[in-house]
UniProtKB/Swiss-Prot annotation:
Organism of this sequence: Homo sapiens
GO MF annotation list: structural constituent of skin epidermis; structural molecule activity
Highest taxon above the source species: Eukaryota
Keyword terms, alphabetized: Coiled coil, Disease variant, Ectodermal dysplasia, Hypotrichosis, Intermediate filament, Isopeptide bond, Keratin, Ubl conjugation
Cysteine disulfide links: none
Gene that produces this protein: KRT85
Name of the featured protein: Keratin, type II cuticular Hb5
């Protein structure tokens, strides 16, 4: 550190004091504190003027460089400086000699850092990046708020859905009861159909017995018909034999007639040739023609009566056989129709029974499936409820994390706002000081874990560098904690309080 002081006195009783002080903080130092006691020069005499210049430079990689000037005016004298402003006692109202200090002719080595503008530019870029990060944090907070609203909407929807799902159990129970009643009805129908099937089977057995009896009667009738046909054939053969005998007898009678006629003619010829008178007793009176005619008539009568009786008997038998055949055929046809009808009824009842059995099996399967689906739905609902509760718990945890991050982001935003306001205030104070000039300022730069206060407003932060300045133009002090750009981003806690000291501390 270098410090120079100059004193100039004029002949008109005006004394000017000039001082120069430069301080360079170590490069790797973590805490640098430079303080300058304020000079409160008060003089009621004329011609007192003081001027001071001080340069503070911290060449560390993470710290800022700050140059501060102070001004304090009295009633008749002015002084400039950090440590001790030029103080001059009251001078007598006489002409004094002028003394020139040759050392003032040498150029002042203010040791102004040429990289100060670059450092300021870097600080501006850091502020811009911090603002960008803050905007990103704000967007993230908005996105997380949207996600929170979405999760709340989902949670309300799932709660409503849970209420809807709670009504599924009575619905399933009612449906199962309906299926059970239908199954009972099907069982009753199956019992009724089984009794009807037994009755139909009994009727079928009766019809089968009747059919067998009719078949036996038909076989008996056919046997009788065969016997009658044999009798008819025998009668026809007998008739043929009789007709043949009749023809033979007719031929024989015709032969005998011709023979007798020839004998009679021969005898008549002999008789005509001889005249013999014979007297004989012909009491027998045998007339062959009458006998033959009578026999022939009797034979014809017997033959005609036999033919008529045979024909009538044959016709009657044929009519009886035809009637029997027609009757048995009609009975057989009706029996066949009844058998076909019974077969169709049996097939229909069998199909209905099979259909009832299939329907019963389907209903039992449907009841079992409905019970399984109900159990599966209930288990699925329980699983979904557990998942939703887990998701709700996770959402609450995520919400807590998001709220924590949001609080951290808001803390970062608040710190950045305070930092920006502090930098703006420092710049405005520096410009005001350069334009008007004020008293001396105490500046303290430190790196610590502390809080920030601004006009009674305190704010606690993470470890950083603290810059403390002494009395300002408004009669207060400014304390600034600059964020350590090399430190990792960590959660920060904050608190604010207001007072009269007008100190600012930010992270």
């Amino acid at each position: 550190m270098s410090c120079r002081s100059y004193r100039i006195s004029s002949g008109c009783g005006v004394t000017r004091n000039f001082s120069s002080c430069s301080a360079v903080a170590p490069k790797t130092g973590n805490r640098c504190c430079i303080s300058a006691a304020p000079y409160r020069g008060v003089s009621c005499y004329r011609g007192l003027t003081g001027f001071g210049s001080r340069s503070l430079c911290n060449l560390g990689s993470c710290g800022p460089r700050i140059a501060v000037g102070g001004f304090r005016a009295g009633s008749c004298g002015r002084s400039f400086g950090y440590r001790s402003g030029g103080v001059c006692g009251p001078s007598p109202p006489c002409i004094t000699t002028v003394s020139v200090n040759e050392s003032l002719l040498t150029p002042l080595n203010l040791e102004i850092d040429p990289n100060a503008q670059c450092v300021k530019q870097e600080e501006k870029e850091q502020i811009k990046s911090l603002n960008s990060r803050f905007a990103a944090f704000i967007d993230k907070v908005r996105f997380l708020e949207q996600q929170n609203k979405l999760l709340e909407t989902k949670w309300q929807f799932y709660q409503n859905q849970r209420c809807c799902e709670s009504n599924l159990e009575p619905l399933f129970s009612g449906y199962i009861e309906t299926l059970r009643r239908e199954a009972e009805c099907v069982e009753a129908d199956s019992g009724r159909l089984a009794s009807e099937l037994n009755h139909v089977q009994e009727v079928l057995e009766g019809y089968k017995k009747k059919y067998e009896e009719e078949v036996a009667l038909r076989a008996t009738a056919e046997n009788e018909f065969v016997v009658l046909k044999k009798d008819v054939d025998c009668a026809y053969l007998r008739k043929s034999d009789l007709e043949a005998n009749v023809e033979a007898l007719v031929e024989e009678s015709s032969f005998l007639r011709r023979l007798y006629e020839e004998e009679i003619r021969v005898l008549q010829a002999h008789i005509s040739d001889t005249s013999v008178i014979v007297k004989m007793d012909n009491s027998r009176d045998l007339n062959m023609d009458c006998i033959i005619a009578e026999i022939k008539a009797q034979y014809d009568d017997v033959a005609s009566r036999s033919r008529a009786e045979a024909e009538s008997w044959y016709r009657s038998k044929c009519e009886e056989m035809k009637a029997t055949v027609i009757r048995h055929g009609e009975t057989l046809r009706r029996t066949k129709e009844e058998i076909n009808e019974l077969n169709r009824m049996i097939q229909r009842l069998t199909a209905e029974i099979e259909n009832a059995k299939c329907q019963r099996a389907k209903l039992e399967a449907a009841v079992a499936e409905a019970e399984q689906q109900g159990e599966a739905a209930l288990s699925d609902a329980r699983c979904k409820l557990a998942e939703l509760e887990g998701a709700l718990q996770k959402a609450k945890q995520d919400m807590a994390c998001l709220l924590k991050e949001y609080q951290e982001v808001m803390n970062s935003k608040l710190g950045l706002d305070i930092e920006i306001a502090t930098y703006r205030r420092l710049l405005e104070g520096e410009e005001h000081r350069l334009c008007e000039g004020v008293g001396s300022v105490n500046v303290c730069v430190s790196s610590s874990r502390g809080g920030v206060s601004c006009g009674g407003l305190s704010y606690s932060t993470t470890p950083g560098r603290q810059i403390t300045s002494g009395p300002s133009a408004i009669g207060g002090s400014i304390t600034v904690v600059a964020p350590d750009s090399c430190a990792p981003c960590q959660p920060r806690s904050s608190s604010f309080s207001c007072g009269s000291s007008r100190s600012v501390r930010f992270a």
